[in-house]
């Protein structure tokens, strides 16, 4: 019977804390892109939220929950793919030592779509997807849009 009060105190302390520790951000620029695109393909919005952000860190740590869910839902719809191929990158971005840019060929049913994706180095040293350039991704579910260097 003595164990019950101790157990209740421990449970109370564990429940009183904020959210658990966040998964560490990828330590390489390539891993950030690969993990993000895998999360897009798997429709894993939670994982996408932890791999997309700014130099401050993952959006899941600082963005309001409803806004974040809406944004990653839109990103997932626009970047949904059956496979991908890195066309070029990581490329340095002029005057931005913290950014690297890729051109990614998203493989979709019936076509491929080239999309630029920027990855940023966080203040803590990891890498996150920063800008997915949705304007280049074409309409979700629609025909692929012509883009330079892309075969239709």
Feature annotation, model-predicted:
Residues 22, 26, 61-68, 125-127:
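Intrinsic-disorder-associated interaction segments
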Residues 15-42, 50:
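Short, low-complexity N-terminal intrinsically disordered segments enriched in polar/charged residues
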Residues 30-31, 45-101, 107:
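Short solvent-exposed beta->alpha transition segments
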Residues 1-13:
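Sec-dependent bacterial lipoprotein signal peptides
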Residues 3-4, 18, 122, 152:
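Positively charged, low-complexity intrinsically disordered regions
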Residues 15, 53, 58-59, 137, ...:
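Functionally engaged cysteine thiol sites
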Residues 85-152:
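Exposed beta-sheet edge and beta->alpha loop/turn motif
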